[in-house]
Amino acid sequence: WMVALFGIVVGPLVVISIYFIIIQPIAIGTYCTICLLAAAAMLIMIPFSLDEIVAMLQFMVWNTRRGRPFWRAFFRGDALPGSSKGGTMSFDAHPREIARQSARGVTVPWTLGVSAAIGLFLMLSRAIFDNALPLAGSDHLVGALVLTTAVIAWAEVARPFRFLNIGFGLWLIVAPWVLGGGTIAGSLIGVLSGVALLGLTLPRGKRNAEHYGSWDRYIV
């Protein structure tokens, strides 16, 4: 139940909070630096928690299928046949070792790193290229969504989530032709960013040596 509660707090609630922060400049016409920093802090928590949530769901399914009471296992825990205890770590462990263990289910392929950078760049297009609404609002919104999608996909169990950026890339290509307010440079950069996202999204990127049971087949 602790993992489930943590997943609810870090998953849906964080995504909703990030969404409201994303639309803030569009709704009120100004940026809030503290709000953006808060959104970044919340966003970075998501990929580090997803593998634990997937493991919890898998355990509950497998344990229930073998006839064990669902709610008893949910609140009090249980063990699958043949399972073993994980490695222990002392409280005085080196910070580097703690960070390494925390990031076991997270990898950052260069394709997703560049995708995140493109998203961040698009969020600043209004200031850099002097774009005006409605294109400036579109670039900010899509850029924030691209950044959020790429960072969530750093979690290996959520790697297929990156395919959402294909839709965002297609919109970036179309947006300058259907929305006004863009400068020539800003519109051109938006189109090129969309094309780049299409190419960057297709490769899965590197994986580490970790395996996630039956979830491995979904990591494409």
Stretches found by the model and what they are:
Residues 111-131, 145-146, 150-153, 165-182, ...:
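Extracellular/lumenal glycan-associated surfaces
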